[in-house]
A protein has these predicted regions:
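Extracytoplasmic catalytic/substrate-binding loops of multi-pass membrane glycan-assembly enzymes
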Residues: 7-14, 191-194
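Glycine/proline-centered hinge or cleavage motifs at structural transition points of membrane proteins
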Residues: 146-147, 160
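Short glycine/proline-centered loop/turn elements that form peptide/ligand docking sites
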Residues: 135-139, 238
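The alpha-helix within a helix-turn-helix
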Residues: 143
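Membrane-water interface segments at the C-terminal ends of transmembrane alpha-helices
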Residues: 1-5, 18-133, 161-177, 186-188, ...
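Short cytosolic juxtamembrane segments of multi-pass membrane proteins
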Residues: 233-245
């Protein structure tokens, strides 16, 4: 409308933020993002950390080839990854619904979560691998000599030292999932509509300042996460005995 596109506005107002919090469509998509992103992040952190630790071992063959395959989702254009995921998860979804009798809505969430986890794993692998570069492997051997099993060694020796890298990778994975729109449009349905998807629909179907209000909220979330990353980086440097410049 003419009033909607009029600048300068009549006055400062928070009504578009109120529209975001009071509108059912915006809130449904927001909560979908809050459900999907954390679960995808947990999967990414778990698998990515294990992969990084495994690839850090000297006896693993073809480490470069394996690493290239694992980080390929970050390198390959997203539209290509989304197309491949569409065919793969379509077959998987049909199997889960027809053979296992699972609910269609639940299967949709599973597909989106797994797809976002795949996109987040490369970030976790890279950050944890970078942290492991300065890790003294003699600590794990000493723990084994003292009778600690591999699980105890990981949680009591390795994890405290690589924790900043794990959290950094998790934050990158969370941001990737929370801001992703292409893959979820390929493999998701209306029930799994996320916040970026809702913003994309809003840009196509209407011109509303509510979209700008939502974008501002997302920017604030991203800035907060980046500040957390910087604090973790400084903590990691202190643990390694490096003085920040």
């Amino acid at each position: 409308t003419t009033e909607m596109l009029q600048f300068d506005p009549a006055g400062y107002s928070l009504k578009h933020y109120q529209d975001f919090f009071n509108n059912d469509e915006w809130q449904r998509s927001f909560w979908n993002s809050l459900i999907i992103a954390p679960i995808a992040t947990i999967i990414s952190v778990t698998l990515g950390t294990l992969a990084a630790i495994g690839l850090s071992q000297s006896h693993v063959p073809a480490k470069r080839a394996i690493m290239a395959i694992l980080i390929s989702p970050m390198i390959v254009p997203l539209i290509i990854s989304a197309t491949g995921m569409f065919f793969f998860y379509s077959s998987m979804g049909n199997f889960m619904e027809d053979t296992l009798g699972m609910d269609k809505n639940f299967v949709g969430y599973v597909k989106v979560v797994l797809a976002h986890a795949v996109l987040g794993i490369p970030f976790v692998i890279i950050t944890v691998t970078a942290t492991l570069v300065g890790f003294d492997s003699s600590l794990t051997r000493a723990a084994a000599n003292m009778g600690a099993n591999p699980v105890t060694t990981f949680f009591r020796v390795q994890m405290p030292l690589i924790f900043p890298g794990v959290v950094s990778g998790g934050l990158f994975a969370f941001i990737t999932s929370f801001d992703e729109v292409v893959v979820v449009m390929f493999i998701g349905s209306a029930s799994q509509k996320t916040l970026p998807w809702q913003m994309f629909i809003g840009l196509r179907e209407q011109i509303s300042p509510t979209i700008l209000a939502v974008a501002t909220i997302l920017v604030c979330i991203s800035v907060a996460l980046l500040m957390t990353l910087e604090l973790l980086r400084r903590r990691s440097e202190r643990l390694r005995g490096i003085t920040p410049g």
